[in-house]
């Protein structure tokens, strides 16, 4: 017998392995003899357990949990501009065999048998440790960002149809969320509790969510507003209604209660959707809608409606509806309106200057909250606009007309088929380029649109745009500065203390100081952050997929490392492991169709124990006409063909998709088609299918060559499957390598056909359009490949790599003797992988089947190789290559290496003759480690409650700077002004204050009981001005607050938008209680001072007010209240000689 022939690189790899125990005697056979005796006899394997080596040390690696931030490889927190280190150098190629493992390992239910799984030897390409080809390193707890409270883990997208979360808002003890079908809220005291589980009553997608309570079904909730004064949460809805919900819902004290709660009040506010609602400094509710509509619902009408009984809801709704004030009609003169008719997307209340900002995408309008007057209209550059309601331009129509004329075909002389085909293809490519060029200007304008607005504690206004620019404005609408820390769209803001939190479309959260300087940055979600909210000691973030996380207000800081260390030690409590078998099939069908028998032979005979099936086809349909049509369809977001649909249906029938498998999705690009099926028994653990396409033909514009991909979440880990057709011809090795590199780096996944951009045929998403826009300066963090961050990536298809340095006859001779070991030495792909030029760091099982190209159709056996004039040399064009979380050596499956795979089948179906290629199938066995999010959240709660150091840190957050107020009683007459002082007596902490009105009392002259009128929304009465109404006081400093009486504002009531003035209150003295709420820069508790302000209707009615001690009210997070006297505090500044007579 001949000895086994091993290639030099394989011999070096095997020689480097040093087993811990002596290996049993190994039988030696030549591959020829082996294949003659039994075509697929397993080769005896070497154990690699003791020979494992990691390419990168843990201290050098970039960690992130794929279940948290799998689409971004740069999950690194940035603090004061410092980032974590880079990973190591490139890996070398190798030839390894993973150890056999039992099929029952893990809890996966993929129909697998319980016998041992024999893994095949695999060749590993070099270069896997460089650039985007680094293997992503995971960890049980991500050290690249602060630890978080996962209130609602990322649900699978398909479970959220019709009930996606759209926004969030936070109270002192609750987090509310607006949904597509209503609202829900969480009690924060239950935030660390376990979820209801699969057996609970909660719908699919919320099994691991912390206990929550849900409302009755409604129209989609587009916005939320917390009203602390009335203890209500207001919501604006797509159907134009505004609804009020009580914070203290009855019968929701326990998590077991599943009865939906109902709204307290609702009315028809707008004809279109309610885009935003706010409550002004004077207690009025402002709402906005499409078409430039802004309405005001006065405090008086709201309060009257809220005192009505529940049985009188209809009357209450009618009362509010008739009180609405349409501001657009009030600023329209002779048919010309002073504000734009474009949609009003946001409203912002400036509590410092008592103003309201209305935000349209490219302009702002500034309003006086007290008298509802329009103050200013200006654009995003800060330039004042006198008239903005102009008729729309026809420029785009003209351009479209020009495009039609320019693209019209001209009569030409008769041409040959190839010439006409070339013109058709290049004409389609030219149309794509013209469309992209024509839309570039509009795209640049769109990137400047305002997507978010917020007010900081110092009264500065911050806006964020699609291009990542953050602009700072003063309260008068003057643009002060702009910063740009991230080249992605700003989607939301949140302010807490003296910090500004920014949420980006990339999933990043950044923390800025009041000057716009970057403090910290981290990847919070794998999808865009659409809303941020502060409360309960957390900054809560909501991503587009519906996941909700809470970040501690101290993060990043010392608290993070303590929690991370403790939680990592609890890994065994929440780590879980499952397994699944994956069948991957590839076939170049040569524009033909297959019989059912061929499909069953290829796929049906191999799926009995498989959980996932990924199929890639090439040359489904070709020809110049089809390619041109396909390119044109791609430009308008349409893909697929009748032939492609036939293949999907035929393969589905072969897989028995009605009973056994479920088709998850597909993507077609010209002749390339990829589709994926999942066994129904594991369907609840698989979802979030995304698609992608990258053309490589004709200047990267046409899909005759290229790749199509599917990305899917399996047991909370990300797997990517890419079907490729690379450049043809023996000498085009460099082009094939370049095609792979282009596909790997350019593939951007999206949620489906509706989000495909029309800018270019190969543009997969709008995100890629933003990335490729020449006006956008991209940083390295956006240039990372989506494939680089996946846990498992499988490439398959017609790679077109050929055999080199060998003749047709020599190749046929080797094949007839099954001497595949000699042929592999002539394989272009093996050589290029060996040199680290392509498929860097990826694996391919040892090929033990004959070359799959090129055959004569319908000619069986090995005699079917091409015997025509060209006599193309047989080659292994059709391949399957993959990588998982392992580096070169075998690694045990764990949360640090969550996907560990091996090849258990790799063969060609030589009996199928419908094409000039043979179909290939490969079966992978994947062990998958993942986290039980519900249990981990519970473990986090135990750590927070039991760790003494953490408890001490949380206690420190309750500290509030000592402050004093110069008076607690103010007496005003008509047009009087009084100035009092708030002093921060702390020498180290800044004090942040906000002034609200608790209530109003009408003092009767006839000695009757005073008429107490609570200010439910904490709004000021219209006769009183307080300036500033909020701000920051530096350590050991003071700030003056002006209180002014305005006698021109009477009690207002509006009926059908017409003001009804009431003068009954003018004869009575009025008294209000101002509450000054004070907190520190990072306080979770507040201290309040109260001041009584009394207005006398005439000088003769002046009363001597008895000076009393200032009372402070301290409110902690649990809602308890304590009172303490303020009489002996030092540092008070008095701006009056007598509280009862001094007037400003």
Swiss-Prot record:
Keywords: Hydrolase, Isopeptide bond, Magnesium, Metal-binding, Repeat, Ubl conjugation, WD repeat. It comes from Arabidopsis thaliana. WD repeats lie at residues 158-196, 216-255, 269-307, 445-483, 524-561. Expressed in young seedlings and flowers. Residues 870-885 are annotated as: Catalytic 2. One of its GO terms (molecular function) is phosphatidylinositol-3,4,5-trisphosphate 5-phosphatase activity. Its cofactor is Mg(2+). It comes from the Eukaryota. This is Type II inositol polyphosphate 5-phosphatase 14.
